From Swiss-Prot:
Belongs to the LSM14 family. InterPro entries: DFDF (IPR025762), FDF_dom (IPR019050), FFD_box (IPR025761), Lsm14-like_N (IPR025609), LSM_dom_sf (IPR010920), Sm (IPR047575), TFG_box (IPR025768). Homodimer. Component of the decapping complex. It comes from Arabidopsis thaliana (Mouse-ear cress). It comes from the Eukaryota. PANTHER family: DECAPPING 5-LIKE PROTEIN-RELATED, SCD6 PROTEIN-RELATED. A motif (FFD box) lies at residues 474-489. GO terms for molecular function: protein homodimerization activity; RNA binding. As a component of the decapping complex, involved in the degradation of mRNAs. Promotes P-body formation. Translational repressor. Residues 1-17, 264-279 have a biased composition (Low complexity). Its main location: cytoplasm. This is Decapping 5-like protein. A motif (TFG box) lies at residues 498-518. GO terms for cellular component: P-body.
Amino acid sequence: MASESSQSSSPSSSQPPSSVPSPSPGNNVGDTFIGSFISLISKYEIRYEGILYHLNVQDSTLGLKNVRSCGTEGRKKDGPQIPPCDKVYDYILFRGSDIKDLQVNPSPSAQSRQEIQSEQDVNQSPHSRPAMTMSSPISGYDSGYGLGRGSQWINTPALSSKPVPVTQHSSVPLSFQPPSANAGSLTESPVSLIDSTQSNAGSSMPIPSFVQGNKFASSGVPLGMMQKPVSSSSTIPNGPQIIDYFSSPIMGLVDDSSQVVTRSPDVSSNQSYSSNPSPLGQTQLHTPPGLASVSSNLSPPSEAQLSAPNIQKIYPSAPQAIGKVVYDPQSNHPHRSIPHELPAVASNSAPVIPGPLSKSPESFFDMDPSLQSRQQMVYRGQEMFAATNPASANVPSQSFAPRNHAPLLPLPVSAHQSRIPSSSIEYTEEFDFEAMNEKFKKSELWGYLGRNNQRNQNDYGEETAIEPNAEGKPAYNKDDFFDTISCNQLDRVARSGQQHNQFPEHMRQVPEAFGNNFQRPPPLQPGQGAYLAAQTNYRGGYHNNNNNNYYSNSGYGYYSGGRGRGRNTHF
């Protein structure tokens, strides 16, 4: 049988099953608590959790099984805290004297456990549902890509061979791929499907980007290129977008190959699209929205001039600069995808735009192939972006400037450099200290300060030395100064009754040493307060009249001997 140890405050190891106390008999009062979850705190502030299986009221003992120690949990005031233990004990028998606090929590029933398990399954169901395939017709399913008519896309190999997982929070199939090689087997055109989807789902529904023709059938376009939604804003109307996937070095401007670069159609914002699909072998003229005013003044080319074979004959391998719209790959919401105009290079099937945007093939690849690095391509992309800007549409075309060209305007001068004069003084020789010492008139300086004899020149140019003052005051006399004011002789004289005869002499010595303002009266006998008040300015106002060569003092004095008021003159 195991019990809690008073020294280590930890339960002992489990004993053999033979010594385990049997459950309480049926007539015991505590049978109703058998099987309850017990949380008790021992007298050593350690909390234990377990299931009650034995309770004896007569012996004041209880037994727990599957017991786990939770430690002191900060309740212990003296000594170190005991951390919780992960070990689960088979059983522990507690005495009533070892228990400080006890709480009974009824054990959950089997029905409540099933309800908790079912709630957990419901919460995890969106992440664990099996994947659904598009090989069977689905009624009422709309993924946002115009697949509301699932029966019309059943025969498409690109959709029937790819499983599409469907979750609760996402309405877009993750492995959607538009048809490439077998595009002719579609029962309905993609444009009509988009129009029908938009009429049902609204203008905020994302639109897939389809590929005209089968020129990407053998190129192996990555799947991530076909999953980017197109923003449906007022500046870019909803309609079929054509993907330009090319291998020009200028693609270094776009991070990774997962970016989708699309061209906006050549129509103004107040025009509408027609739902008729365009032929697969025909290419249309596309212009950025910012150049609508420029392209409106130009005569539209004929279909024969815009056909792919004619363009390939004129420029078999020269890409053209066309304004692109790159959408944010991190945003899957149509309202969060903000278009950014970025220069790019169209493929061979892109048309030639007349005007300032049309460049000769030699202007792009006029340098040595070894010099066409990534940085040079970025620099050329910036020049092409400036060419596609509407503000610079009327500027005549110019050849690209070299990378290391001089600035057109002088660089601004900082405030620190503007205070520095332009003509700097250059010192070619060292500083001559001896010559500077000769120029320095040390005698005049020291004579002015009184530390040397000042030499003056008379009217005839002769120098005369001024003799020092012979009537200078001598040094102090020790007997007359320090000994008179620093000893206690005056106190002894006052106590012996001789102070009245020596007081006038003392009053003459004190003003000579400290002046009249620093006089301090000596200790007096009783009855001499009036005399001291008449002779000193202690606590009195001072008045001096230099014209009459006299000064007068007046004041009040309060001493132990009496009170007096007087007025005196210089003596």
